[in-house]
């Protein structure tokens, strides 16, 4: 079996977790109490969904997930919500004081009191797996718990489970909408710490998702529930190949193999289509060609950046629903001929395709229309460096004045960590720049480079 353990850290992680597990349960026909009428075999059979759910002797399906927050209020909503019976009480872990948007509190002072308990629970989940393939970690960059505690957890997971894949789903601070002034600090500190521990990180930018909700779903003022349900659909598309028998199956390590050309360049850009409200869907025929085309519209991306200014290194199309390979090949051929998609010259235009015959499911009473087919595109493009550049710039503005730094130092951090993290991100931007340079021109001077 190829099990995956999901770890949801901090408010953003937990709330995205709620949306994801709600959707998984609907997709697999699992009731909120964990019973699954369609599953006739009692005990852990070799059903594909057992990658995400473990099965008890009584036929109850329990998510292989841990929810962690340093303060109780958000996880308490899970404890008293619709799905309270789905999770084992030990899977919901909370501390008493929050990280107060402070990376240092999440990573050092408050985080270290909880980390051993969390690792212990993760160990219990890992012991129930016959062949654990890795971890999916959900968190935000901006919050104290999401940034500080996650990076501490990643370091410890690398020690305990060295070779297992670790994929992150990270909420990137939106360029305009901000929940904390110190987001740039937290983001850069957490990215620096987790860079060497994460195998692949899918970033989600709140503002990009706000815009998609406003533009495509006509929601005037999107709430976090609207955003998270959309994020849930994307996570579901990425993990569908692990949970269903697909025609072309993709597992966790396969993503990395196809999307990550160098260990540090592991931030694929995700795009999802069609995002459409029920009123509109009724009048539109969404063919494979149309949804494939939509993936190359910057408007449908989950991070604000412009791939037309960058180059693609790899591209992975995950289709689900009523899709046949012939249509996909035709759609991709069309795109290759007329699109201005620039691949780096050291990577022949490779599209990796996955097809899953399970159509997308929607949450009843949600905003998304029920569609016959959908696609999620994961592409590794140099354009995502724009997102880092924006963040680094904000960091520089504050750090030049050493604003707010005393809060971090007061929690046991050293000021040197700031400059070290910032240098690491400058190096990351440089890495992206070098990857996009044509190898023919650069051959002479780059002899001494490590690549």
UniProtKB/Swiss-Prot annotation:
Keywords: Acetylation, Cytoplasm, Cytoskeleton, GTP-binding, Hydrolase, Magnesium, Metal-binding, Microtubule, Nucleotide-binding. Mg(2+) binds at residue 71. It comes from the Eukaryota. The active site is at 254. GTP binds at residues 11, 71, 140, 144-145, 179, 206, 228. The modification N6-acetyllysine is found at residue 40. Dimer of alpha and beta chains. A typical microtubule is a hollow water-filled tube with an outer diameter of 25 nm and an inner diameter of 15 nM. Alpha-beta heterodimers associate head-to-tail to form protofilaments running lengthwise along the microtubule wall with the beta-tubulin subunit facing the microtubule plus end conferring a structural polarity. Microtubules usually have 13 protofilaments but different protofilament numbers can be found in some organisms and specialized cells. Belongs to the tubulin family. This is Tubulin alpha-1 chain. It comes from Aplysia californica.
């Amino acid at each position: 079996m190829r099990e995956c353990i999901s770890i949801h850290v901090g408010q953003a992680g937990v709330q995205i977790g709620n949306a994801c597990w709600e959707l998984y349960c609907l997709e697999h026909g699992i009731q909120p109490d964990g019973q699954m009428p369609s599953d006739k075999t009692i005990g852990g059979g070799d059903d594909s969904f057992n990658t995400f759910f473990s099965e008890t002797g009584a036929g109850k399906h329990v998510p292989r997930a841990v929810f962690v927050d340093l303060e109780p209020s958000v996880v308490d909503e899970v404890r008293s919500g619709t799905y309270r019976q789905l999770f084992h009480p030990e899977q919901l872990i909370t501390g008493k004081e929050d990280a107060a948007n402070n990376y240092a509190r999440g990573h050092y002072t408050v985080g270290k009191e909880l980390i051993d308990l969390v690792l212990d629970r993760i160990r219990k989940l890992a012991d129930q797996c016959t062949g654990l393939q890795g971890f999916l970690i959900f968190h935000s960059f901006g919050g104290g718990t999401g940034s500080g505690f996650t990076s501490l957890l990643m370091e410890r997971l690398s020690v305990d489970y060295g070779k297992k894949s670790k994929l992150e789903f990270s909420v990137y601070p939106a360029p305009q909408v901000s929940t904390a002034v110190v987001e740039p600090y937290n983001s850069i500190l957490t990215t620096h710490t987790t860079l060497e521990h994460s195998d692949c990180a899918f970033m989600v930018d709140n503002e990009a998702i706000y815009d998609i909700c406003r533009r495509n779903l006509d929601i005037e003022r999107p709430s976090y529930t609207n955003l998270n349900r959309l994020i849930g659909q994307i996570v579901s598309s990425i993990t569908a190949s692990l949970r269903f028998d697909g025609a072309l199956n993709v597992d966790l390590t396969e993503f990395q193999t196809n999307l990550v050309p160098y260990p540090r360049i592991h931030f694929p850009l995700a795009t999802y289509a069609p995002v459409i409200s029920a009123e509109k869907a009724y009048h539109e025929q969404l063919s494979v060609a149309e949804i494939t085309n939509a993936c190359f519209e910057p408007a449908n991306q989950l991070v604000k950046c412009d791939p037309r200014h960058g180059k693609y290194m790899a591209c992975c199309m995950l289709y689900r629903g009523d899709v046949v390979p012939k249509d996909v090949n035709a759609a991709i051929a069309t795109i290759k001929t007329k699109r201005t998609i620039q691949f780096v010259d050291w990577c022949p235009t490779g599209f990796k395709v996955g097809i899953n015959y399970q159509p997308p499911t929607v949450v009843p009473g949600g905003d998304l229309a029920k569609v016959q087919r959908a696609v999620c595109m994961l592409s590794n493009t140099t354009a995502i460096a724009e997102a880092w550049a924006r963040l680094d710039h904000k960091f520089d503005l504050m750090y030049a004045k050493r604003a707010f730094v005393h809060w971090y130092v007061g929690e046991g951090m050293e000021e040197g960590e700031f400059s070290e993290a910032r240098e690491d991100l400058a190096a990351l931007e440089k890495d992206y720049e070098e990857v996009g340079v044509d190898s023919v021109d650069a051959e002479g001077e780059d002899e001494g480079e490590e690549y």
